[in-house]
C-alpha cells in the first residue's frame, strides 16, 4: 500500500534518467551504511520500525490532533482495513510510542532552523516535549487495548 511517486521518472522522456530515478525509488531505506550481502541490502528500516505508512499515520494524529493511543488505534483499524490486521496495527503502534519517547532527546538538541509544514517533531516548531519524557501511560493504554479492556 506504500505510495510511490514515480510520475517524473515515468514521464521525463529520458530512459537513462528514468532508470536511475526508478532504481532510487525501489531501493529500501537503510539506517546503516552496511555493505550488501550477496547484492541485497542486509538491513532495512521498515523491518525494524514497521511500515512507513503506519508510522506516518500515527505521527500525524499524535502531533496534529493530540489523539490518544486508543483513538489512533481505532482510526488506524478503519483506515488500513484490508491492509493490516489488528495485531499488526497494535504491534507497530506500540513500537511507534516506545521509539517516539525514547528518541526525544535527539530532537531536543537540534540546531536552529525553519519549521516546514503543519506537523513537525522539531522543538523549533510546535513540539514542546521534555527530553526525558516517559512513554509509560501511552503504552499502558495500548496494553489495555491488547487485553480487550478498552
Features from the language model and the residues they span:
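ATP/NTP-dependent adenylation/nucleotidyl-transfer catalytic domains that generate, transfer
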Residues: 4-150
Amino acid at each position: 500500500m506504500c505510495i510511490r511517486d514515480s510520475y517524473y521518472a515515468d514521464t521525463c522522456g529520458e530512459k537513462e534518467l528514468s532508470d536511475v530515478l526508478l532504481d532510487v525509488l525501489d531501493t529500501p531505506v537503510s539506517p546503516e551504511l552496511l555493505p550488501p550481502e550477496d547484492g541485497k541490502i542486509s538491513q532495512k528500516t521498515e523491518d525494524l520500525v514497521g511500515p512507513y505508512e503506519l508510522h506516518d499515520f500515527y505521527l500525524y494524529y499524535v502531533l496534529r490532533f493530540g489523539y490518544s493511543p486508543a483513538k489512533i488505534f481505532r482510526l488506524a483499524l478503519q483506515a488500513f482495513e484490508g491492509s493490516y490486521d489488528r495485531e499488526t496495527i497494535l504491534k507497530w503502534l506500540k513500537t511507534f510510542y516506545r521509539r517516539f519517547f525514547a528518541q526525544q532527546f535527539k530532537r531536543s538538541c537540534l540546531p536552529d532552523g525553519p519549521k516546514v509544514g503543519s506537523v513537525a517533531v522539531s522543538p523549533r516548531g510546535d513540539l514542546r516535549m521534555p527530553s526525558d519524557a516517559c512513554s509509560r501511560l501511552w503504552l499502558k493504554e495500548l496494553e489495555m487495548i491488547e487485553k480487550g479492556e478498552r
